Regions:
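Generic C-terminal helix-cap and adjacent flexible tail
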Residues: 179-184
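Short beta-strand micro-motifs in enzyme catalytic cores
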Residues: 23-27, 72, 122-124, 147
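A glycine-rich, hydrophobic loop/mini-helix early in the fold
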Residues: 47-75
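Acidic, metal-coordinating catalytic segment for phosphate/diphosphate chemistry
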Residues: 12-49, 54-55
Length: 184
């Protein structure tokens, strides 16, 4: 039976974990068809991602270790949007912290949910143009080991197809920006 536009009714919400970056909760809902069920949800404040482009048309990516997948993965610079922070400010900070570049211009590409089946995390995607290398790159945090990787848009596309770039937020943002990047 289709639900139509009627939203489910929240019967009970139970918070199981509140961490620094996310919360985990279980919600008891009554659906419009009167069926009741429990739905798990990861609450996240949102993230911002940037595709930095050098004046030569190269894209700046980072390769870093991600404990959750026990691997060093290739991705575009991104970070959690802090409370009250504009997502554009998040990417300006992340470009500098993760790559040692500064963008003269930040252009919004769009926004999308990362995994709406279990999380409310939204990703704000941007293009960073007019990059300049910082004279003094910031020091990496003790828990970060980041390698900066420069690639052409065509090389990024090949990295996606080969599985070297397997980060969903980076792939989604690249798809949004692809036509702009390939025409430069």
């Amino acid at each position: 039976m289709p639900f139509g536009s009627e939203p489910p009714q929240l019967l009970r919400r139970k918070l199981f974990y509140q961490g620094r970056k996310f919360a985990y909760e279980v919600n008891r809902l009554r659906l419009p068809n009167k069926v009741e069920g429990e739905f798990e949800c990861v609450r996240h404040p949102g993230g911002a991602l940037v595709i930095p482009v050098t004046p030569e048309g190269k894209l700046v990516l980072v390769r870093q270790y991600r404990f959750t997948v026990k691997s060093r993965i290739l991705e575009f610079p991104a970070g959690t949007v802090e409370e009250g922070e504009d997502p554009a400010a998040t990417v300006e900070r992340e470009i500098q912290e993760e790559t040692g570049y500064k963008a003269a211009e930040i252009e919004k590409l769009g926004e999308f949910f990362l995994a709406p089946g279990y999380s409310d995390e939204i990703i704000y995607a941007f293009l960073g143009k007019g990059l300049e290398q910082l004279e003094q790159p910031p020091e990496q945090d003790d828990d970060e080991d980041i390698e900066v990787v420069l690639m052409t848009p065509e090389e990024v596309e090949q990295a996606i197809l080969s599985g070297d770039l397997a980060d969903a937020k980076s792939i989604s943002a690249f798809v949004i920006a692809r036509s702009m990047l390939m025409s430069q």
